[in-house]
Amino acid sequence: MDFLELARKRYSVRAYKPQAVEDQKLAQVLEAVRLAPTAANNQPIRFVVIHTAGREQELRRIYDRDWFVSAPIVICGCGVLAEAYVGKGGRNTAEVDVTIATDHLILAATSLGLGTCWIGAFDPQAAREVLGLPQGVEPMIFTTLGYPADTPEPKERKALEDIVRYETW
């Protein structure tokens, strides 16, 4: 499938089959993370893979949704702030780097028939505690990973001319 077809196929999956994700497919989506670009190639990204079976109650502390804990795998994208490039104005790029790597993961998963869902509204303190994150490692994004048990609804997107400007605003 070409890239635009892949981008159109991706959707936020909120129901998962109990079927396990094969190790080979998990390795492929994690390789996509590894290959993602980062500012100045500093690679301040770390990903924690969590198999949810038997951990549902503690994972609910992070994000209390049935569909979150019903996915066979949940992945947390973390940034190591001290390793990230700091640009002009003091902007630390760790969150941007983690976001790019997570998008690589999500698109790779989609290409393999797996479903995902971005989760940004999680409890960061609970994530630090449940995942045992060391000082200086910040949880930035979660995604579920598994085989979809739902069907995508039509996506509403703004028209291109509403989001793109040429040369100046």
Residue ranges, per PLM feature:
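A glycine-rich helix N-cap at a beta->alpha junction
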Residues: W67-A71, I75, G132-P154
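Short secondary-structure boundary segments
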Residues: G79, A121, Y147
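Acidic, metal-associated active-site segment
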Residues: T102-T110
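Active-site helix/loop module of the DD-peptidase/beta-lactamase fold
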Residues: I119-G136
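Structured binding elements
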Residues: G113
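Glycine/small-residue-rich phosphate/adenosyl-binding loop
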Residues: K25-E31, L35-A101
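C-terminal helix-cap and adjacent tail motif
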Residues: F3-V13, K17-A20, K25, I141-W169
